[in-house]
């Protein structure tokens, strides 16, 4: 299977998000890369489902709470930007203050 660098990145984010979900199920708090991956995966999958950009920007800020991440992680993440493929093309989605 030959994958482009972008496809490899998408798979890596998806896999990291799966690990993050499993850790949350076990009650383990997420670190920085896991939190970013989970939010990014939410946006990418939402775009694939055809949800509008504005909806994903708002909903992306409710994927993870402060209680679900390690101390200091929420303060480290101000914005998450994800290039996602929508039915009408690729768009950059920015989730502001994603961990509240």
UniProtKB/Swiss-Prot annotation:
CDD domains given in the database record: Urease_gamma
| Quaternary structure and interacting proteins, as annotated | Heterotrimer of UreA (gamma), UreB (beta) and UreC (alpha) subunits. Three heterotrimers associate to form the active enzyme.
Gene3D superfamilies documented for this protein: Urease, gamma-like subunit
Which UniProt keywords are present, listed alphabetically? Answer: Cytoplasm, Hydrolase
Species annotation: Rhizobium rhizogenes (strain K84 / ATCC BAA-868)
Subcellular location, principal: cytoplasm
One Gene Ontology biological process: urea catabolic process
Q: Give the domain of life.
A: Bacteria
The record, for InterPro entries, names: Urease_gamma, Urease_gamma/gamma-beta_su, Urease_gamma_sf, Urease_subunit
By what name is this protein known? Answer: Urease subunit gamma
Enumerate the catalysed reactions.
Answer: urea + 2 H2O + H(+) = hydrogencarbonate + 2 NH4(+)
Question: Where are the disulfide bridges?
Answer: none
Annotated pathway = Nitrogen metabolism; urea degradation; CO(2) and NH(3) from urea (urease route): step 1/1
Molecular-function GO terms, alphabetical: nickel cation binding; urease activity
The EC number on file is 3.5.1.5
GO CC terms of this entry: cytoplasm
KW Cytoplasm (keyword) present? yes
UniProt subcellular location: Cytoplasm
UniProt KW Protein biosynthesis keyword: no
Q: Which family does it belong to?
A: Belongs to the urease gamma subunit family.
């Amino acid at each position: 299977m030959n994958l482009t660098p972008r496809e490899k990145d998408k798979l890596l984010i998806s896999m990291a998000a799966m690990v993050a979900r499993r850790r949350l199920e076990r009650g383990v708090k997420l670190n920085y890369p896991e939190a970013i991956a989970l939010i990014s995966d939410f946006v990418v999958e939402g775009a694939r489902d055809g949800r509008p950009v504005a909806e994903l920007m708002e909903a992306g800020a409710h994927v993870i709470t402060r209680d679900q991440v390690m101390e200091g992680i929420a303060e480290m993440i101000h914005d998450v930007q994800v290039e996602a493929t929508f039915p009408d093309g690729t768009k950059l989605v920015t989730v502001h203050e994603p961990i509240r």
